[in-house]
Amino acid sequence: MKLTDNVLRSFRVAKVFRENSDKINCFDFSPTGETVISSSDDDSIVLYDCQEGKPKRTLYSKKYGVDLIRYTHAANTVVYSSNKIDDTIRYLSLHDNKYIRYFPGHSKRVVALSMSPVDDTFISGSLDKTIRLWDLRSPNCQGLMHLQGKPVCSFDPEGLIFAAGVNSEMVKLYDLRSFDKGPFATFKMQYDRTCEWTALKFSNDGKLILMSTNGGFLRLVDAFKGAVMHTFGGYNNSKAVTLEATFTPDSQFIMIGSEDGKIHVWNCESGMKVAVLDGKHTGPITCLQFNPKFMTFTSACSNMAFWLPTIDD
C-alpha cells in the first residue's frame, strides 16, 4: 500500500492508551517497527507492541526521570536522558531493567539525542552549548564541540554526517570521521526572535532537513544547498510548546500535531496542506512519528494514540 493524499486523509485513531499520568515527552519505534517505547514526565517507560496494538511492559526511572528515549541497535536496549538530578545519559537493558552504562559529561539538560542509523555511535546536544559524540561501548565522550548557543542535532540516514542547528539561526553539517576539523557546510537561516528551534530531522532519502520550532511554523530545508524550500504554518501553538514534527517514511509528506489535538499534513514537494486529522487528544500533541515499516503512525499527549488508514488504496 502506497501513501497518497487520500490514504493520509483516511487515517483515524484505532486505539488510545492511557498508561501515563503526565505528558509523554518522547517515543521511538524499534527499527523493525514492531514495538514503540515511550518516556514520560511521570518517570515511566512504556513498551507497546505495534502489531497487537497493546502495552507490553512498564518500567520506571523515578530517581532520574526519563526523556528523549531512543532504541539502540541491540534488541531490548535504549538510551535516554535525565530530566531530574543530573544530566547523565543512561543505557538501559529492558530485558532485566538494569543499566548497562552511564555517559556523564553534560553540565546542563540534554535537549537532543540521536542514534546513528548504522552503528553504536550516538550524539547528544545540551543547554551547556555543546554537542558530544559517544560510543555505546565506552562511558567516555568520543568527541566534543563547543557551540555559540543551544543545539539541536541529528544523524543523516547513512550515518556518515550529522547536522547541528545552532542558536535557532544556522545549520552546520559535519563529517563524522573528521568532525574535529569543523563543519564542511554552514547554512544561515533567517532568525525569528518569536521562537526557537526545538528539533532537526532528516528525511529518509537524506535530501531534506525539517526544522521544528516552538512557534507556529516549521521549515523544510534542502539538505545539500541549505535553501528553505517551504515554511509550513496554520496550526495552533500559542503556548510555545515543543511539538514533534515528522516525515513519512517515503519522504513525501510532513506531519505535525498541534495544541488543540489536531494533526496537520503537508506535501513536501508542493508545500500544499493535504489533511487535518482530529486526534481528540486531551492536550497538545507533543510527540508524533510514523511507523518505519507499517502503515500506521502514533501521536501522544499524556495518552498514546495509534492510527490506521480506513481505505485500501
Swiss-Prot record:
Keyword Ligase annotated: no
Spell out the subcellular localization from the entry.
Nucleus; Chromosome; Cytoplasm
UniProt record, GO biological process = DNA-templated transcription termination; lncRNA catabolic process; negative regulation of DNA-templated transcription, elongation; negative regulation of lncRNA transcription; nuclear RNA surveillance; positive regulation of transcription elongation by RNA polymerase II; RNA polymerase II promoter clearance
Q: Where are the WD repeats?
A: 19-58, 105-144, 146-184, 192-231, 236-276, 280-313
Signal sequence coordinates: none
Q: Which Pfam families is this protein grouped with?
A: WD40
The record, for InterPro entries, names: G-protein_beta_WD-40_rep, Swd2/WDR82, WD40/YVTN_repeat-like_dom_sf, WD40_repeat_dom_sf, WD40_rpt
Q: How does it assemble?
A: Component of the SET1/COMPASS complex. Component of the PNUTS-PP1 phosphatase complex.
Q: What does this protein do?
A: Regulatory component of the SET1/COMPASS complex implicated in the tethering of this complex to transcriptional start sites of active genes. Facilitates histone H3 'Lys-4' methylation (H3K4me) via recruitment of the SETD1A or SETD1B to the 'Ser-5' phosphorylated C-terminal domain (CTD) of RNA polymerase II large subunit (POLR2A). Component of the PNUTS-PP1 protein phosphatase complex, a protein phosphatase 1 (PP1) complex that promotes RNA polymerase II transcription pause-release, allowing transcription elongation.
Name listed for the protein in its UniProt record: WD repeat-containing protein 82
Natural source organism:
Xenopus tropicalis
User: What lineage, starting at the top, does this entry show?
Assistant: Eukaryota, Metazoa, Chordata, Craniata, Vertebrata
